[in-house]
Amino acid sequence: MKTIPLTLETEALARRFVWFEPPEEALSDTDRFVAYALARATHADMMLLRRFLMDDDLREALDRAPPGIIDPRSWAYWNSVLGRYPAPAMPVRRFG
């Protein structure tokens, strides 16, 4: 997966999507950051991120998404947009 550089624009996105940690930390884990983006980004936000990420990067982020970040509606939408229909099973949290 490609890294997303820290710019003024990506810093603003990181502050909105992953508000509970510094932007540098949020962007350091690309798969996790993209999972938050897939759940929370607007169309304009995704246009910005698509400057750095291709379809394969988004598919990879979906495959590696931590459980509990992407809601079912966003999961179905992004898998469909990326040519995966029906969508694979969502990530599941495991305890113990």
Language model regions located:
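Long, compositionally biased intrinsically disordered regulatory segments in eukaryotic proteins
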Residues: 1-96
